[in-house]
Amino acid sequence: QRLSARGTLFGLGQAGVPDSLGPQDRDRIERWLETAENLPLLEDYVLAETETDREITIGATTLRCRMDAVFQRLDGSGWLIVDWKTGRRQVPVDQLSVYVHAWAASQGVPTGSVRAAYVYVDYPGGRVNELTAEGLLSIEQIQAALTVG
């Protein structure tokens, strides 16, 4: 296990890595964890929750979200949801809008205080695709997408 400068503990056990995993796979996961703990994105944040579930009802549909990691700003002023990606296939970042709305509702905070990003740990140094304020889908937009799809 390692303790980063930001106080976030990352270790193979916490990542759910079984003891039976081979050395090559363990090395790859260690690289991913090292990438994660050195991300500039996480500066000024501390890990609050991992593999946490939230639900949000939009229209007649209840969506269940499992968030890989949620970090809180050190000063308590905001949140950062991270969805770790171990592959390189890019996922549309606007899908994180559901996570932002679900987390904000569960904490009783405005969506403007919640950031969200996909972090692709298989790239050297990591690749971050963050949902921007302009890219955040409204509840109405999500509801419209649910009724179309």
Regions found by a protein language model. Give the residues of each.
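Generic detection of long, well-ordered alpha-helical segments
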Residues: 18-29, 93, 136-143
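Generic alpha-helical hydrophobic packing signal
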Residues: 1-3, 63, 79, 115-117
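A non-catalytic, helix-rich entry segment at domain boundaries
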Residues: 1-56
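Short acidic (Asp/Glu) and glycine-rich catalytic loops that position anionic groups and cofactors
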Residues: 6-15, 78-80, 119-127
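Non-catalytic protein-protein interaction segments used by genome-maintenance enzymes to assemble
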Residues: 53-98, 104-106
